[in-house]
Amino acid sequence: MKILLLGEYSNVHATLAKGLRCLGHECIVASNGDFWKQYGRDIDLERKHGALGTLEFLTKLLRHLPQMRGYDIVQLINPIFLELKAEHLIYIYNYLKRHNKRIVLGAFGIDYYWVKVNTDIRPLRYSDFNIGDYIRTDEIAECIRRDWLNTPKETLCKHIAGTSDWIVAGLQEYWATYNEVVDLRKKMSFIPFPIEMAKDPTKDKTANNKIRIFIGISKSRSVYKGTDIMLKAAEDIVAQYPEKAELIVASGVPYEKYHKMVESSDLILDQLYSYTPAMNALMAMSKGIVNVGGGEEENYQIIHETELRPIINVLPTYESCYTELEHIVLHPEKLAELKRQSVEYIHRHHDYIKVAKQYEQLYLSLL
């Protein structure tokens, strides 16, 4: 097959492309590299700031658009798959729809349905937009609602979701959300995110008998993602048990340094309001780092995992984070098994070749 993967989130498309190429398919990734992360791509669609950057981007886009014709499959990372306004993107989408055989939409991140369903219907016990029946009103959540509800982004998302040939959800939460939309559930499936396994994942990183706890801080999204709560719990644990634990905090560091800091740790704190580990945590788990975050039973059920339980699941409260961290700090002998299970979990369910085979089956079924 001839496949175009358009857009990028956290290395999903770049990793999937590697797997599809290993299976013998022609696969092109066109993206901006996910902004500052600069993931690999075949066609660079990065948009730089300023009028000159806009002109350069539009020139690149017009030059590459004719190369985006004649594919068996075009997969979009999100309804906002290029750095363009929604009212302009709709014309690019319609062009792709006309000149390629099948369009697949990724439910991999924030879009209209993720915002609307989790604000109004609330199928999840907690999410980026609700905790039970309580609607979250932190600044970022409200900003995202204003961005996606009753705007051109809503129109674009509905149009692409309604006219695409299939929708793939990459996390259980996205699957549960889209499953609430009656007109879309008949053309939707779940496929896990692809991860390229680490070469030396089980190396013991514990230093001086201290458990090393890592947390990455994005100040603008700290409250929205629950990092503020996780950070406070971790700080209090280290203050209470300074001889047993140490905290590694990454904030505003270059991406390469960020990953080195992750790799030096034993635990990673990530995504308090999630049921499942996303790409950051999954990549850490592949290296034998234990994820403290989303590990609800729904996560294991959707992948039919009945044995492994590598994730230290926490509820979206300070008390839950503190209790779970304290337990592992006081029982460090449990770490080795959790690390082993973390690597096995990724191998079973997220290995990029296995995931690529699932996409291959889906794509072939659409042709």
Identify the residue ranges that each predicted region occupies.
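Short hydrophobic beta-strand element within catalytic cores of glycosyltransferases
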Residues: I289-E297
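Acidic donor-binding loop of glycosyltransferase active sites
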Residues: E263-T276, I289-V290
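Membrane-proximal helix-turn-helix segments that form the acceptor-binding/catalytic region
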Residues: L65-R69, Y91-R98, D128-I167
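A charged, aromatic-enriched C-terminal amphipathic alpha-helix characteristic of glycosyltransferases
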Residues: E333-L364
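A short, active-site helix/loop in glycosyltransferases that binds the activated sugar's phosphate group
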Residues: W114-V115, R145-M188, K232, Y359
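Acceptor-binding helix/loop patch of EC 2.4 sugar-transfer enzymes
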Residues: Y39-R41, L105-T151, S220, E296, ...
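Conserved donor-binding/catalytic core segment of Leloir-type glycosyltransferases
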Residues: S189-K225, L231
